[in-house]
């Protein structure tokens, strides 16, 4: 039997502009043994109700004012769901990316525990791939190196230090070792800390450079993150008991 895969994604109502196109694609992937779970962290229940009306399995979690907390809480709900329901892989796919219909087969074909596609993100002052081969920090941000493109051109399956959760498949063995986290006082998102934990544990991470995924990015989320960066400085660092999820009934 083919590995059992859960396609999971945190969502919120700021992605309403793309959600129907995203759902149309994920409902029609060619892989034979996958399920879908979207976890809504919007402030109201309206977006979750819309997703449910489109025939998608959705869970609504209690709102938290901090956007970084919302993401980690949502992603850990998905992680726990994978482990508790016998899935072999968590396919993390962000809802503003539209992958090819055979994306799961292409990722599984590499037989790696952590492997993803890639996409461009808008990061002032340049547009760059959302991945890194080495940890190079400038002003507490990961710095982009232009020679990355040369490496990508020469290597189909490239070993990296950091991919992203935008399009990545993770084996349950890895999820059993690593719980998603963030540090409120730091600017980096939870996927950065996941890949740092992979490095610490000697877990290899790969990106298929052939799998460039269209990314329909907006900037509402960027503004939320900027707002939270200011607020985060007033708060304490990551504490596991501050990141518990609570399911909300949308019926």
Predicted regions mapped to residue ranges:
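Short, acidic, metal-binding catalytic loop of nucleotide-sugar glycosyltransferases
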Residues: 23-34
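Active-site-proximal specificity loops/subdomain of glycosyltransferases
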Residues: 46-87
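Short beta-strand/loop segment that forms part of the nucleotide-sugar
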Residues: 33-43, 60-63
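C-terminal catalytic/acceptor-binding lobe
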Residues: 157, 162-164, 172-173, 177-251
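Short beta-strand-to-loop acidic/aromatic patch adjacent to the donor-nucleotide binding site
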Residues: 86-98
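A structural helix-start
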Residues: 11-20, 40
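Conserved catalytic core of nucleotide-sugar-dependent glycosyltransferases
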Residues: 100-182
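Cell-envelope/extracellular polymer assembly enzymes that use nucleotide-activated donors
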Residues: 4-8, 35, 193
């Amino acid at each position: 039997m083919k590995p059992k895969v859960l396609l999971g994604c945190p969502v919120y109502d700021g992605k309403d502009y793309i959600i129907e196109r995203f759902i149309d694609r994920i409902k029609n992937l060619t892989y034979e043994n996958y399920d879908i779970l979207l976890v809504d962290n919007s402030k109201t229940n309206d977006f979750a109700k819309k997703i449910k009306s489109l025939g998608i399995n959705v869970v609504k979690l209690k709102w938290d004012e901090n956007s970084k907390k919302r993401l980690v809480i949502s992603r850990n709900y998905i992680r726990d769901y994978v482990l508790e329901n016998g899935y072999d892989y968590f396919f993390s796919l962000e809802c503003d990316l539209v992958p090819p219909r055979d994306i799961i087969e292409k990722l599984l074909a590499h037989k790696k525990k952590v492997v993803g596609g890639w996409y461009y993100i808008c990061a002032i002052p340049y547009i760059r791939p959302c991945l890194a081969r080495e940890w190079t920090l400038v002003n507490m941000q990961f710095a982009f190196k232009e020679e990355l493109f040369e490496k990508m051109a020469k290597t189909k399956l490239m070993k990296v230090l950091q991919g992203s959760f935008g399009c990545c498949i993770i084996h349950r063995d890895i999820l059993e070792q690593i719980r998603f986290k963030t540090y409120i006082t730091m600017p980096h998102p939870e996927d950065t800390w996941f890949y740092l934990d992979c490095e610490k544990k000697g877990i290899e991470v790969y990106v298929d450079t052939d799998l460039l995924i269209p990314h329909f990015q907006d900037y509402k989320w960027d503004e939320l993150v900027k707002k939270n960066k200011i607020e985060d400085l007033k708060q304490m660092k990551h504490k596991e008991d501050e990141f518990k999820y609570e399911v909300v009934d949308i019926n």
